[in-house]
Structures are given as C-alpha cells and as structure tokens.
Amino acid sequence: MAVAKKRKVKKNIPEGIVYIYSTFNNTIVTISDKQGNVVSWCSAGVLGFKGSRKSTPFAAQNALADAAKKAADCGMRKVEVKVKGPGPGREAALRALVSTGFEVSRIYDVTPVPHNGCKPPKRRRV
C-alpha cells in the first residue's frame, strides 16, 4: 500500500524580515518571519547568473523579486529590511522590494564594522 502524500499547508504570515546580504561577488536574499524561521530565499547564482554577472545590480533585483514572490504567496505584506555588506546589489535590491508592493517599516544597516580587528587583504595589482 502506498504512503499517503501530505498536502502542503499554506501559511499566513503577515509580517516578516528581509535580509539582503550583498558581497562583491553575489547577492543573497532571505525572507523570514518575526521569529527567524525562513519563509523563502534566493540568490543571484540560483537564478542562473554565473561568474561576474552574479555581482550586478540586475541580478540582485531579480533575486529579491523571486524571493518576494514566494513570501507574498504566504500572505506577507509588511517587512523590516536588514542590509549587510558593501556589494553593488544593495540599492537595487531595496528598489526592487519597494516595487513589489511590500510595506517597508524599517531599514537597518547591519554591516559588521571591525574595531581594528583583522588585517585586511592586500591591494590588487592588475
């Protein structure tokens, strides 16, 4: 006898947190509820951008739009935004979030800043 397949229960999550982690090579977007449970996530690499195309603002915009669509299916409308990292996708991802129709309540910059910790990598000579 075959095992009965469980139906996926549709969650109703009205508020959440959007984490935008933007590095020089990629942009990763994670959307969670207020408790920190991940609702959806996406990155530029998952969408098929490879190599230097992952670090473009356009790739970050598409990554956020994809993650936001999945979160909107769960009923999410109001979000807080936490942005981390110095990458080129920061502002593009924020603009994409506003255009998807989410109500943004707060924007935090949580980029870690060292209090003179580790020595940074040496300058590139090309």
Curated annotation (Swiss-Prot):
GO terms for biological process: translation. GO terms for cellular component: ribonucleoprotein complex; ribosome. Keywords: Ribonucleoprotein, Ribosomal protein, RNA-binding, rRNA-binding. Signal peptide: none annotated. It holds the Pfam family Ribosomal_S11. Belongs to the universal ribosomal protein uS11 family. Located on the platform of the 30S subunit, it bridges several disparate RNA helices of the 16S rRNA. Forms part of the Shine-Dalgarno cleft in the 70S ribosome. This is Small ribosomal subunit protein uS11. The gene is rpsK.
